[in-house]
Structure formats: structure tokens, C-alpha cells
Regions:
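Long, contiguous C-terminal modules that act as interaction/assembly or targeting platforms
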Residues: 12, 42, 131-132
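Secreted peptidase-domain scaffold signal
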Residues: 73-160
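Extracellular S/T/G-rich loop segment that most often corresponds to the catalytic His/Ser-adjacent loop
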Residues: 1-27, 31
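Noncatalytic accessory or regulatory domains flanking protease catalytic cores in secreted, cell-surface
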Residues: 165-175
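Alpha-helical metal-binding/catalytic segments enriched in His/Glu/Asp
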Residues: 29-40
Length: 175
């Protein structure tokens, strides 16, 4: 496969039509999306929520040939949808937003994940789940390549049995 570069149409310094590539071309579009989402939400400004909604809506073009395992590293998280499609789900999808603050060492276990009964077939849940995690990491530029001082892991799966946990302990949360 041959790599084909498709640039963004713009204007050169002398006013002529030009094309170019780079992340800075996405800045005006993402800024407009963020402003549109904020206006549509009509609530206190929450940059992490807006970032999460934009990122969650992004997808790759069908003709994308970059391997799935390399996409985020090579081309980012994809192309975000427009504001109405970000804010309003289709009739066959739902978006669950969980917001909280975690102190160092804390964890959240969601043991009763709200799955609609219509997705239950022969004792198994069917459907697609897309999880998007957005957080505000602790950054320390003096730490070189380890400047990001926050690591969060997301694990999704099922248990054979459900065990009740003592959620009164400081480091265990179950919203």
C-alpha cells in the first residue's frame, strides 16, 4: 500500500489556494465544536466533559487502512461528529456519563452496570460498548519522559459471581 496524503484546503501567504497537513488545521473545527457543545449544554463550563464528548464521538473513515492497533498513535482518535450528533443519540444507542474525582490510590468498581434488558439474549448481553476515559492528569515537567504523573486503567468484563464489597473504605467507590 502506498500512502496518500490529502491536505486541508487553505490559502498561502500570497493569497493563492494551497493544501497542507498538520494538527493545527483541526484547531478551528474542534474549537467550534467545543463552543457549540457548551452552548447546547447550557451548564457550567466543564472542559473535561466537552473533551470527552468530542473524543467519544470521533471515528475513523471507512477507507482507513492504518491498522487498528496503530490508529491512535498515527492519526489520533478520528474525526468527531457534528454538535447535534454528539449531543443527541440515535434511537438505538445510549451514552452514560460518569463524572467523579479520584484521589491517588482510589478505584471505582461499577458492579451494577445499567444494561437494557432488550440486549439480553439466551442469558448473554449483546451489543457494542465503547468506553471513553478523559482525565486531567498531574503533570510534572521536571520528570522528563515521565512528566505525566497519573495513570488510569479501565477494565471491562464480567464476573462469575458478584461479591459485595465494603464501599465505606476510603479507596473503594461504587457509584
Amino acid at each position: 500500500g502506498e500512502t496518500v496524503t490529502t491536505g486541508v484546503k487553505s490559502f498561502s501567504k500570497d493569497g493563492k489556494m494551497a493544501t497542507g497537513v498538520g494538527t493545527s488545521f483541526s484547531t478551528p473545527r474542534v474549537t467550534a465544536l467545543a463552543a457549540g457543545i457548551q452552548q447546547e449544554l447550557s451548564e457550567e463550563f466543564d472542559p473535561l466533559l466537552i473533551k470527552a464528548l468530542i473524543t467519544h464521538s470521533a471515528s475513523y473513515p471507512k477507507e482507513m487502512t492504518v491498522p487498528v492497533t496503530e490508529r491512535a498513535k498515527q492519526v489520533g482518535f478520528g474525526i468527531p461528529k457534528n454538535v447535534p450528533d454528539i449531543i443527541y443519540n440515535s434511537p438505538y444507542e445510549a451514552t452514560l456519563i460518569l463524572r467523579d474525582s479520584l484521589a491517588k490510590g482510589d478505584k471505582i468498581d461499577i458492579m451494577d452496570f445499567p444494561m437494557p434488558q432488550c440486549l439480553l439474549k439466551d442469558g448473554y448481553y449483546t451489543g457494542q460498548i465503547i468506553a471513553t476515559l478523559v482525565y486531567d492528569p498531574v503533570l510534572d515537567p521536571s520528570q522528563g519522559i515521565e512528566y505525566c504523573q497519573s495513570n488510569i486503567d479501565v477494565k471491562f468484563g464480567s464476573y462469575d459471581t458478584k461479591e459485595e464489597r465494603d464501599t465505606s473504605k476510603r479507596h473503594i467507590l461504587n457509584p
